């Protein structure tokens, strides 16, 4: 297994505030990597640096490198980066007035990819089937995406993301606003998607991390300066059964968090 994303000595700022400090991490291709740790330790900030969404915040900047297949992410066209590295947010965010069909194809149109309508329909169906949504919506594709349930909306957002064939999918607590049944559906989908995509997921649910991920990176707030730092990174089984760092052990055992 090879590294698709290489994070090297990465420090991220929001103005004068340092959110994460000197993070180095390898993300393996075709795997699911979970980022866990207490609130405020920089997990979501790190995620946003991986497709350059971080830089859209006023005063934001980064030091260090993020390499995508050996190429410096911050030397590439940001539009290209966001095609290669998709993002799924905490709360489902379909375009509420767009139809289900239009939602799936939105990324294609935003990236100005011209494909025949027949091909569009084939792509839409393939993406909806990939997220196990086709059977639930195939007879109402013209209805607004905002009419779907929360779990269906999140799967629609994932269908929209995979329509542009990203190599990496970033997920920022994708189940935090969902009920247990919808959460289970998303977790099953994550395990399915890693066959074609590399996935990085932020989650506060340690049971979820243990269920869906191959690798886990543990973060904490540094005692000096209050910025987030990487504590430990290993195979998920190792993290949850025999962690090497006392901070990791204390976190997964519920002593803080």
Curated annotation (Swiss-Prot):
Positions bound to ATP: 37-44
Subcellular location: Cell membrane
Single GO molecular function: ATP hydrolysis activity
Protein's membrane topology: Peripheral membrane protein
Keyword terms, alphabetized: ATP-binding, Cell membrane, Membrane, Nucleotide-binding, Phosphate transport, Translocase, Transport
Pfam families hit by this protein: ABC_tran
Keyword Nucleotide-binding: yes
Main location: membrane
SMART domains: AAA
InterPro entries, per database record: AAA+_ATPase, ABC_transporter-like_ATP-bd, ABC_transporter-like_CS, P-loop_NTPase, PstB-like
Residue intervals of the ABC transporter domain: 5-246
A biological process from GO: phosphate ion transmembrane transport
Source taxon at top rank: Bacteria
A cellular-component GO term for this protein: plasma membrane
EC number assigned by the record: 7.3.2.1
Signal peptide range in chain numbering: none
Catalytic activity: phosphate(out) + ATP + H2O = ADP + 2 phosphate(in) + H(+)
The family this protein is said to belong to: Belongs to the ABC transporter superfamily. Phosphate importer (TC 3.A.1.7) family.
Record's subunit section: The complex is composed of two ATP-binding proteins (PstB), two transmembrane proteins (PstC and PstA) and a solute-binding protein (PstS).
Function noted in UniProt: Part of the ABC transporter complex PstSACB involved in phosphate import. Responsible for energy coupling to the transport system.
Protein name from the UniProt record: Phosphate import ATP-binding protein PstB
Gene behind the chain: pstB
